[in-house]
Amino acid sequence: MLFSKLFAPTLKEPPKDAVLKSHKHLAQAGYIYQIGSGIYNFLPLAKKVLDKIENITHKRMQEHGAQNILMSFVVLASLWEKSGRLDKYGKELLVFKDRKGNDFVLSPTLEENITEIAANFIKSYKQLPVHLYQIHTKFRDEIRPRFGLVRAREFIMKDGYSFHEDAESLDKEFLNTQSAYKEILNDLGLDFRIVEADNGAIGGSKSKEFVVLTECGEDTIVVCQNCDYAANIEIAKRSKRLEPLNVPKAQLAKFPTPNTTSAESVAEFFKVEPFFVLKAVVKKVIHKDKETLACFFTRGDDNLEETKALNALNVLGANALELREASQEDLNQVGLVAGFIGPYGLRKHVSYIIFDEDLKEGDCLIAGANEKDFHAVGVDLKGFENLIYADIIQVKESDCCPNCQRALKYHKSLEVGHIFKLSQGYAKSLKASFLDKNGKEQFFEMGCYGIGISRLLSAILEQKSDDLGCVWTKNTAPFDVVIVVSNLKDEVQKKLAFEVYERLLQRGVDVLLDDRDVRFGAKMRDFELIGERLALIVGKQTLENKEFECIKRANLEKQTLKDRELEEKILEILESE
């Protein structure tokens, strides 16, 4: 490719609203162009990188037995109604009507669509298992699109779905796809982790995320520094904590505690560890057609993890869509006083009460007395009937691993893949069944598997690039080599550059010849910005000594290559990087 023919509209400065370096570099280097909030055009350089990522993905998925299909981007809303996700997904789901008044959605995921296909064409256990996947455009109407391709509204995704006759077969495919995803991310040269994760709006019985470690990541993962335990903070667990030695022994009594509304101030007032303070967190629960209140109790030195709390409510059959902060007015309406809420008589005030599992058998506690400026001491939860316990706290870095009891540590990360065991949920709601070996009708066991293809462009750059511009990995750079002519007016240099260009093309090198009539410094700046893996300089030294200066983009390391061994050395460097 000749640079003079390449459509790569580089900018002098990155967009002013760009925060992440990946967004800055992709826009400034002419990879992407934004045409709306969270909506981007992929220009030739980006398309080359996308093609390389997609080719790797196709190769690995098909090696693991998956079949490539292409499904409609537009889906009947009635299918989403049947699955129950039309309301659950919320405003991120874009719903529209056609000219005849029929409701459709722009799909963020396609569980409903693929289940409809399976229900119509897979009739017997003999056709199972089957794993179908696609790479296609998706749309999620993000309330605050940001960070370029990291949180876009329109994006490219690889999504796959598998159908099975039993849970054992699903388990095997879950592990098979996990292996395929590991190979894909290894091929892309990424440093990643596989972590236990929340199922979210997709649902199912189990899921794992594939996350890239980067300080700008949106997510926090909790990782053991000793064993292989790793989980998204939304579901991370810890081992049971040891009780502090200075237990505040007291008979049940009510004490005046003026202006002590936080767990920390209560602990300080009574000269005890926050561990013994019962912290109450009241949330407004949003259902499809109503709002209720729920109270969650944790120890005073713990914080509520809202995803865990929402899941705990739904285990109780709450069908909650989301949790919101309860206002002072919400509390006043049910007769509660913020900062003094406790378990005594609470059931008449709120619809749901859940205690963190760390409070089981808890005694010697201090809790709100449900009266302004009063707390109760000597609270023993064993004296209450039918309390509901669940894991609802956010794990802290000081907590210990649930597997080996060693210290846990936070890492910032960016999710690039997610795999789920859906079990029979979608099959039952959409009535997708087959005949088993005994001729009996059974619902499919399902799995679903996704990789954010367009997000991977940002993930690679967040992990690999520097302040100068894009640094791509071995298998993702738009070009392996850019040939830079020091003085294009020197016909000998120009002729030699074209000769080297042809020599490298014949050896299968993906090469770009910068034949533009611009300053040498500008060409080198574009090399740093765009991120070809190597720059090969044709200049006076080349003519005088038959030597080329070669610069690696990853670390800007320079070396001299002899003309007689040029192709072999270039191939050797490209293979080793």
Swiss-Prot record:
It is found in: Cytoplasm. Pfam families: HGTP_anticodon, tRNA-synt_2b, tRNA_edit. Gene3D superfamilies: Anticodon-binding domain, Bira Bifunctional Protein, Domain 2. It is an enzyme of class 6 (ligase). GO terms for biological process: prolyl-tRNA aminoacylation. Coiled coil: none annotated. It catalyses: tRNA(Pro) + L-proline + ATP = L-prolyl-tRNA(Pro) + AMP + diphosphate. Catalyzes the attachment of proline to tRNA(Pro) in a two-step reaction: proline is first activated by ATP to form Pro-AMP and then transferred to the acceptor end of tRNA(Pro). As ProRS can inadvertently accommodate and process non-cognate amino acids such as alanine and cysteine, to avoid such errors it has two additional distinct editing activities against alanine. One activity is designated as 'pretransfer' editing and involves the tRNA(Pro)-independent hydrolysis of activated Ala-AMP. Belongs to the class-II aminoacyl-tRNA synthetase family. ProS type 1 subfamily. Homodimer. This is Proline--tRNA ligase. It comes from Helicobacter acinonychis (strain Sheeba). The gene is proS.
